[in-house]
Amino acid sequence: MQRQTGHMEDKKRTGLESQGTENAFSDGRDGKDGLLHEGINEPILIPSTIADLEGIRELVRKFRGRLLPFEKCPDFCLRIGGLEASFHKGQEELLEYCEALYLPQPVKMEIVGIVDDVPCLATGMQLLILVAEGGEVYAYEEDTLHKLATSFSEFLEIGVKSLGREVYHCGEYIEQVVH
């Protein structure tokens, strides 16, 4: 599998760095239509509120492969996609594990993409990004889920800044089976 280049290298390759597009959001949009997010390749209109997991699935379907830089975490970006674009390709059960084995209660989730080259213990230093049915955003790092944001729009703003602050370990909330 070919790895995606880092965020800064992508900006240089596409010429965006010299155009001064560090600010990822357009200030000229009203919240009615959504946020105009400056993707690495071209602007992407992201709904200001994605109401449900179907909205996340549609976002991934529509913008698969696009890179979105984070406003307050410019060294990283979200690469929109599913497991197929990650080091976890072929591990379809991973989503089910994240839904059932990490949080205090089972929660439906959708994979929205990955963040590459994060200094962490994840395979290939690649965080798998998931959105829960309540809107919260999590990062999967080996046997750990990190809560990154309370909403997808907050995540697009802060990126991975809160990595490690709220952590859930695999099986932490599963009751011990006593024989």
From Swiss-Prot:
Biased composition (Basic and acidic residues): 1-15
Protein known as: Uncharacterized gene 87 protein
Region: Disordered, residue numbers: 1-32
InterPro entries: US22-like
Pfam families reported in the protein's UniProt record: US22
Protein's organism: Gallid herpesvirus 2 (strain Chicken/Md5/ATCC VR-987)
